[in-house]
Regions:
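Carbohydrate-active catalytic/glycan-binding domains of CAZyme proteins
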Residues: 20, 25-486
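Positively charged n-region of N-terminal signal peptides that target proteins for export
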Residues: 1-6
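Bacterial N-terminal signal peptides
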Residues: 8-21
């Protein structure tokens, strides 16, 4: 998907990398990590830039671990704490709100994303009409875990909260739902908003051109208005009080009190979408200084009238705070060729050996580190980064020259990099013609100007000026350490 670039201005983007033991943040030395997702990430452009996203690829098959991953936190020794859910469904047909489903929270550790050691049960939920959905996230400020589970009753899907101070000892919060809404959710902590963010399905009355199994309700005063799936973004400082607090009530109208959320609280398809598109599920996560979300899209089908149709595709969304979302990559199927066997993610990524990894039961999917999104060009183009304080370190570039979608441009593709001072003047010795990259595809290309390194400029405020053709630029980093993803 390509997004034409308007002029934009961005302020300083620097980062403190965090190593976590059970998610407890330990500050390290300042590190540069510049990502490129939208026009907000570039300054003073020339030419035609576009922004894109990378679909996941299958890394390898793996044995199902007996649980579904929900939250992954890096440990100081390079391994990862993994929290997830083991779920067992009541075999009785049409059990519905009388179902006797069982679930438990589990903890394990991993070094490779497929082998899980030290597996233990940390909480066993009461038997009941639970769904198999789980959201689990960690607030490093208060050092508290939050888990959200859905429990069915005649009103619909009640969102129930569970808390833990250490990931091992969990307590149910209150004997009532936080709110009611649709039967799908994602959950993560936004360090920018200082809030838990819940990305949940909700239902909107809508005139569907092709009707599927979506319900209708007499309260809508129009039998042609049918439920379509859209998203709602809720947030909470502490996981106990949520905004918005409104509920999707009596979703099956069993109590005669059906009520949808107000339309202004919904994230709905827009004029750039197919008219029958629906947002079936969204699972987001924090990555460095922004959040990404994998959204599962759906559309009814004329081949299956009044029945559930196949899922349509998946999509990458991006946000600077977890609350307001952009959709610049609509034509990219986020989970790649694993769809429709894999229709969404269930956890924030593991970052192992230069890869962003997602476990999907019997497959491990991945993307090279920092390559979820990129800025690129077809012909010649230029842009500057936001200004940043140069650390005492070398700079590295994550780039593909030529871009993967333009292998025929191998001989003509290039990236050139210059360094500008705080006045926008080229720093002598760091002119762009001294740093030229061709026929390279690497996440950590050393940026050198002859025999010189930007390390010489440590302590100064600088910007990089990029010149590119038929290339993708994913990130600029200092050092080789990982990035916190929550």
């Amino acid at each position: 998907m390509r997004c034409d670039l308007p002029f934009c201005t961005v302020l300083v983007v620097t980062h403190l990398w965090f190593a976590c033991d059970f998610g407890v943040a330990q500050p390290a030395a300042p590190e540069v990590r510049l990502l490129f997702s939208t026009s907000q990430d570039v300054q003073n452009p020339w030419g035609r830039l576009h922004f894109g996203a990378t679909p996941m690829q299958k890394i390898r098959d793996c044995d199902p671990p007996g649980f579904t991953l929900a939250c992954c936190l890096p440990r100081a020794d390079g391994s990862w704490d993994v929290y997830g859910q083991a779920f067992s469904r009541d075999a009785a047909p049409e059990a519905d709100t009388r179902a006797k489903n069982t679930w438990k929270l589990v903890h394990a550790t991993t070094r490779d994303g497929t082998t899980f050691d030290n597996l233990e049960t940390v909480y066993a939920g009461a038997t009941g009409p639970w769904t198999d959905h789980l959201g689990l996230a960690y607030n490093p400020d208060t050092r508290e875990f939050l888990a959200l589970k859905l429990l069915m009753d005649d009103n619909g899907f009640g969102y129930r909260a569970f808390f833990s101070a250490n990931g091992r000892d969990w307590t149910a919060y209150a004997d009532k739902p936080l709110f009611y809404d649709g039967d799908s959710l994602g959950l993560f902590w936004s360090p920018v908003s200082k809030r838990f963010v819940c990305t949940n399905k909700t239902l909107q009355p809508y005139l569907k051109h092709i009707q599927d199994h979506g319900g209708t309700h007499p309260q809508n005063n129009n039998d042609q208005l049918r439920d379509r799936r859209v998203l709602a973004i809720r947030s909470s400082v502490d996981g106990r009080q949520w905004e918005p607090a409104e509920s999707l009530m009596d979703v099956w109208n069993r109590l005669g009190s059906y009520r949808a959320l107000p339309a202004e609280l919904m994230l709905t398809p827009d004029a750039d979408d197919p008219p029958d598109l629906e947002h079936y599920r969204g699972v987001g996560f924090w990555y460095h200084d922004r959040s990404y979300m994998v959204v599962l899209n759906y559309a009814a089908s004329a081949l299956t009238p009044r029945k559930h149709a196949p899922q349509l595709d998946t999509e990458w969304w991006v946000s600077r705070n977890g609350l307001k979302w952009e959709r610049p990559y609509r034509d990219i199927n986020a989970v790649g060729d694993s769809f429709p066997g894999v229709v969404c993610i269930t956890h924030n990524p593991l970052l192992i050996d230069g890869m962003i990894l997602f476990h999907t039961g019997n497959q491990l999917l991945g993307i090279p580190q920092d390559r979820i999104s990129f800025v690129g060009s077809r012909a010649n183009a230029e842009f500057s980064t936001a200004p940043f304080a140069m650390p005492k370190a070398d700079l590295q570039l994550n780039a593909a020259v030529p871009a993967p979608e333009r292998p025929f441009a191998k001989q003509q593709a290039y990236v050139m990099v210059g360094i500008l001072d705080d006045q926008g003047t080229v720093v002598p010795g760091f002119e762009p013609d001294k740093c030229v990259l061709q026929i390279v595809d690497q996440i950590d290309l050393p940026l050198r100007w002859g025999d010189r390194s930007a390390r010489e400029l440590s302590g100064r405020t600088i910007r990089l000026r990029f010149y590119l053709r038929s290339a993708n630029i994913y990130a600029v980093t200092s050092g080789t350490r990982g990035v916190h993803a929550g």
